[in-house]
Amino acid sequence: MEADNYKYQRKELELKALLEITQAINENQSEEVLITIFKFTCLVHLNISSLIFYMSKEGGFERRISHGVKTKTPAILLKEAIEEDNGSGTLSIQLQEGYSFSELETYLPVYHKETLLAILFLTRKSKTQDLDIDFTQALANILVVALENKRFSRRQVEQEVFKREVEIASQVQQLLLPSSLPDTEVLKAKVTYIPHSKVGGDYYDLIRGRENKVYFCIADVSGKGMAAALLMSNFQAALRTLLRSNADLETIIHQLNFTLFDTTKGDRFITFFLGEYDFSTKTLRFVNAGHNPPLLFHQQQKQVEYLEAGTTLLGAFETLPFLEIGKRDQLNDFTLHLYTDGLTEAKNPLEEEFGEKRFRDFVEKSQFPDPKEFHYEFMKVIRNFSQDAPLQDDLTLLSLRFH
């Protein structure tokens, strides 16, 4: 009779334990609350005096509960330190010197579809009273599955947030880029833009100025995603404001650098090339701020030169250490090719880069003065070189033909 009463009382306690943990799960309690309830449920309703509970984490198992244990136990169990036999449920754990589970009587591995998700170490309160190992293991399994479901739901939410962020960043970027480029008797323009991912870090623009001037630029911002898109959006707004104020190139570059450094405190930077062409004086002025040097191709002479004069990249220093404004006079009938490093760093299956020399050779030998024809033929060359090898970065090529 006494034995029957004991069994009844034990089953009643187990039922209470089960109800407490399932009720907390149904109420969508936080991970910490669920773990705390599990801990006190084991200590109050089950024949357990001390326990340690490890849950799977990337690279190993993290200690989430430790109660009633005086010896030093590791906060993390590395996966490579655990040898498991799912069939027998036995584990062999290699501990570093100074750590021990000697105080604990037994351990219960918790599996889900042959994957070890948790380990429960415990000691009974009374050696004369039984501990239902199967029930304790089942209770731990319920907790672990609930926590895994929470993790899965959280990852889904994070993925949705990231997906939405990428979509917004992509929309922001599209708004930054010009919707059309000139195709007139005095200026023809063509751009090829191939982002490495949905949101690239390249930016280009062509802006009509006052007094027969036109401004053109290309930039590459460090980083990707929403942060890079917003940074470039602010950069473009500052650039256009300065151009509308009719500021000279020196003032524009210094102000852009100050604004960028003030915003990012040196954590982000932008490589940038800005050019200004005056149709009335046939003068080209430019600044290269750490960007790939554009190619200036003189159509009549069939000569190529790099436009390198300028300064360091923007945003790295509070004050630019030096600044040189490049200038070319009496320019007429010429083409400018502005590009980002995604072009020269494009690789073939042998991991060889396309490089600046191949691009310069193509420009020098080009028989395609029209930018559209030039881009069509050049993209055939680079595709033939890469043989469908994936791009390493965003690829942007902006070609401007001046007559």
Residue ranges of predicted features:
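Regulatory loop-to-helix N-cap segments in sensory/regulatory domains
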Residues: E2-K7, L117-L139, K224, I325, ...
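A short, aliphatic-rich beta-strand micro-motif
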Residues: L95-E97, F101-H112
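… and, occasionally, acidic/histidine-rich disordered N-termini of signaling adaptors
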Residues: V157-H337, A389-H403
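Active-site-proximal, acidic helix/loop segment immediately C-terminal to a metal-coordinating Asp/Glu
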Residues: A227-S245, Q330-A389
